[in-house]
């Protein structure tokens, strides 16, 4: 086994710092992508929800302000978490293939 590849060896402090910085960068990219998706989803769900309450008699009678807010916020939260999760996983997957192995040094 090449030096540095043994699972019994303790990782160096520099290696841990590098992994921590990578994790922070991945999560930051996920937060930004999730926030962008949440804004788009809130607008995309608010417009038809509010329009239907004004134009459809059934929606006017059955969807109060709380129901409207719940519809919009559910779509927003779902978009945020789905996109953030996919972005973090994609970034980690992409960068895991780019890491040089210790045996090549």
Swiss-Prot record:
Pfam families: ENOD93. The keyword Mitochondrion does not apply. One of its GO terms (biological process) is nodulation. GO terms for cellular component: membrane. It is found in: Membrane. It is a single-pass membrane protein. Keywords: Membrane, Nodulation, Transmembrane, Transmembrane helix. The keyword Membrane applies. The chain crosses the membrane at residues 66-83. This is Early nodulin-93.
